[in-house]
Each structure stands twice: as C-alpha cells, then as structure tokens.
C-alpha cells in the first residue's frame, strides 16, 4: 500500500478553505445551527421556568435567606433541562455526520452534487453510524487500557514498596510515569488506527470501521505526526483568536465589567434584564463561532481524506 505525504495531508484543509470559502462558511453555519436547535427548543419549552427559578434563587441569596429556599424549584427545572442532553447528543452526531460527508464529498467526490456539497442521505447515515460505533468502541478500549494500566501501576508500586528506599522510591515514580505514558500512547494509537474509518466508509459507501485497521497498518508514526501538527494548529488558531477577542473587549472599555463587584451587580439584576444586555455579545460570539467551526472542522477533517486518497491512490479534488 502507498505511503502518504504529511505536508500534503496537512495542507489539504487550508487548501479546501481557500478554494471553497463560501462552502466552508455554509458548513459552519449548518453545523452550528444543528447544534443550537436543542438549546433553542430547551429555552422555548423550559426557558421561562428556568429564568424564574434562577431569579428566585439569586434573590434569596442576595437577601441572605435560607440557602435551601428555592432549591427545590431550581432542581426540578434543571432536571427538565437535562432531558434535552440526549437530544443534543443526537443532533451533534447528525451535524458531525453531515459536515464530515460534505468535506469528504468536496475532497473525494466533487461531482457528486448537493447544495455546497451538503446532502442528507445514505452517506450521512453511514458517517453518523461510523462516528457513533467508533466512539463507543474507542471508549471501551480506553476503559480496558486504563484498567490494565491501573493494575500494572499497582504491581509496580508494591514492587517498589517491597524493595524499600531509596531504590524503591525511584521504581515507584519512574514505573508510574512509564505506565501513564504507555496508557496514553496506547489510547492515541487506537484512535489513529481507526482514523481512516470515516473517509473509507464515505468512499466505499459501506461500513469500514475495522477495515481502517488494515489501511493504517505501517502508518502510525506519520499519522501521529499529522495529528500533532493539526492539534497544535487548532490550539494556536484558538489562542490567537482568544487574545484578539480579549483585546477588542478591553479596547471597548469593558475591562471593568470583569471585576468581581461588576459581575456580582450584573447577575443581581433580573434574569431578563442581564440576558438582554448580554444578548449582543452572545449573538456576536455565536456568529463568529459559526464561521470558525466550519474552518476548524475543515482543517481537522480534510487531512484524513487526503491521507486516505494517498494511501489508496484514490483521486482527490484540487479544484
């Protein structure tokens, strides 16, 4: 099986953003909208009760009243809020499946059509299924690896105890460090071995989770290097944008709003008042987040489509 170029794969996401900026923007909006649906539904159905319960709780605390007063109403309201978590999980899987399929379609099957390469069909169903099953399987593997690491770590610790100091102390410290590193490395390795499942499933239109193990054989180290590059890139982009956001926030003279007294006074207002004041910031951050989610998702996922295309010698789009 062919090898792949880390540089070519790493640049695939940036290249796709440059070639299809409006598509990437649309993907971000769709991704954010789908993830926002359960939140909007929750506020529509539970929002008034939640604001009322929250207001009563804050008012009681401000008046130095009984800490338990209002807690029952608040707890009941929050239990209703938690019922939307399952719906949020499903819409998150749906959003990820749709956007992943759009990215893979732009990379591997550009003539497949769809609005901005977006569709809802069997490709998206397969992506959702592979995402769900892979997540469950990796979680099971991770638990087993952690349990094995705990057992090995325990053996090393008691071996160090038996040897006694000072050598025993070194055995315990170095042994436990090595065990933690081995545990983390094994989990990362498992994730990398399954990293071709999504693009392979999209390309073949069949469930390719376990076939990914064969596709990634002999490519673990290059995949690790690629994953590290992508991780550092995502963190760097988020860090720069975070600093820029704080710079804008401070330049507008809003630094005083972060003082403890200002924060306490802000939330001491009626919930509908402070929500109204915060709404422009929430909307602004949401819009920026929509744009960024499409870009970051593309930068993260397109490289794996490129890796798949290179190792299977599948044509990939460059237009």
Where do the PLM segments sit?
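Interfacial aromatic "cap" segments that immediately flank transmembrane helices
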Residues: 2-37, 115-142, 176, 189-238, ...
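Short, charge-rich, low-complexity alpha-helical interaction segments
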Residues: 131, 135-182
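Short, membrane-exposed interhelical loops at transmembrane-helix boundaries
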Residues: 69-76, 258-284
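Short, highly charged, low-complexity non-transmembrane loops/tails of multi-pass membrane proteins
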Residues: 60, 258-259, 308-319
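Membrane-helix interface motif
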Residues: 40-63, 143-161, 241-260
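Selective recognition of hydrophobic, aromatic-rich stretches within alpha-helical transmembrane segments
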Residues: 41, 78-112, 167-205, 239, ...
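Alpha-helical transmembrane segments in multi-pass membrane proteins
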Residues: 40, 44, 51-97
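Membrane-interface interhelical connector segments
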Residues: 160-169, 202, 206-210, 255-274
């Amino acid at each position: 099986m062919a090898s792949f170029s880390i540089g070519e794969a790493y640049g695939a996401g940036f290249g796709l953003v440059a070639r299809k900026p409006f598509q990437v923007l649309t993907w971000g909006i769709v991704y954010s909208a789908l993830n926002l649906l359960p939140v909007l539904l929750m506020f529509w159905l539970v929002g008034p009760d939640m604001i009322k319960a929250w207001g009563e709780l804050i008012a009681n605390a401000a008046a130095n009243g009984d800490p338990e007063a209002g807690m029952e109403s608040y707890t009941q309201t929050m239990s209703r809020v938690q019922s939307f978590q399952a719906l949020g999980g499903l819409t998150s899987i749906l959003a990820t499946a749709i956007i992943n399929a759009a990215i893979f379609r732009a990379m591997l099957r550009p003539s497949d059509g769809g609005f901005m390469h977006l569709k809802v069909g069997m490709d998206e169903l397969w992506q959702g299924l592979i995402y769900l099953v892979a997540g469950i399987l990796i979680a099971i593997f991770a638990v087993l690896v952690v349990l094995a690491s705990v057992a090995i770590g325990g053996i090393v610790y008691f071996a160090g105890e038996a040897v006694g100091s000072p050598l025993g102390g070194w055995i315990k410290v170095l042994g436990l460090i090595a065990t933690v590193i081995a545990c983390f490395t094994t989990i990362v390795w498992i994730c990398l071995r399954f990293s071709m499942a999504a693009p392979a499933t999209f390309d073949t239109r069949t469930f390719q989770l376990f076939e990914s193990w064969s596709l990634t054989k002999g490519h673990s180290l290059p995949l690790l290097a690629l994953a590290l590059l992508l991780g550092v890139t995502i963190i760097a982009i988020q860090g720069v944008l975070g600093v820029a956001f704080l710079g804008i926030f401070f330049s507008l003279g809003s630094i005083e709003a972060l003082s403890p007294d200002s924060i306490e006074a802000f939330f001491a207002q009626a919930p509908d008042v402070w929500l109204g004041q915060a709404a422009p910031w929430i909307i602004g951050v949401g819009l920026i987040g929509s744009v960024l989610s499409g870009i970051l998702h593309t930068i993260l996922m397109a490289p794996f489509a490129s890796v798949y295309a290179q190792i299977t010698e599948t044509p990939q789009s460059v237009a």
